[in-house]
Structure formats: structure tokens, C-alpha cells
Amino acid sequence: MGHEGATFRFTNDLDTPCTFYGYVGAQLLDAAGHALPTDVIRGGGYLFRDPGPELVAVPPGGSATFGMEWVHIPVGAETTCPTSSSIEVTPPDERTFLTIPARIMACGGGTLHVTAVQPAS
């Protein structure tokens, strides 16, 4: 079926609790740090069930997670798909992103399906 995915984890390294509500933003980057085509779709997909947005309280040292999936087989007229070297992830309701090394070959114009942030299990 060509689906791949990963679970990403936010860990609270502060001395105070923090909260999340909703979905992350994301931007795929090439090896030079330039933006690749990226289309973030909220709501999960084939690999990850979306719990929907809920307020997630994370105590100091605690974590929250979200799932991300993509298709790595060319879609429609695509013959190849760009592969990222890293990804910028923006937590819900934030403007500052985190850059994470990640080799992702997202076909379909860089389509990424994401779940809402949820408590880590």
C-alpha cells in the first residue's frame, strides 16, 4: 500500500507544566534546508487513528505524541518523489518550530497526514 509513518514525541523539559491543543504544522526540508512541497492534512490516515483535538496537560518530564504518515509510492503523474533530510514541526498554537532530522519520501505533493497531539502512553 506504500504507507509509512512515525510517532513523534514532545517532552516537557521545563520546571512547569505545559499544554497542547490540536494539530502540528510541518514543513519538509531538503539537505540544504530548503522547503520541499508539503501539504499537511489533519485527521490521521491509514496507520494512525486520530483522537481529535483535546487539551493535553504535560507535567515536567512528561510527554505528548502525535502520529504522522505519508505515501512513498508516486501518485498520479509523479515519477519520483523528493526525500527530506529534516522536517520543521510547529507545535499547535505556536510560531516557533523545531527542526528534526527525518528522511521522509512523501509523494502526492508532499502530503503528510497528522493526528492531533495526545497524551503519551
Where on the chain are the PLM-derived regions?
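Solvent-exposed, conformationally flexible loop/turn segments
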Residues: 1, 59-62, 109
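Short, solvent-exposed loop/turn segments enriched in Ser/Thr/Gly
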Residues: 1-7, 80-84
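Asparagine-centered strand-capping/turn motif at beta-strand->loop junctions
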Residues: 8-15
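A short beta-turn/strand-edge loop motif at beta-sheet boundaries
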Residues: 16-20
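The feature marks short-to-medium sequence segments in extracytoplasmic or secretory-pathway proteins
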Residues: 21-59
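Short Pro-Gly-centered flexible turn/kink motifs
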Residues: 56-69
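Short, surface-exposed ligand- or partner-binding patches at beta-edge/loop junctions that are enriched
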Residues: 74-96
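Acidic, serine/threonine- and proline-rich intrinsically disordered appendage/tail regions
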Residues: 78, 96-121
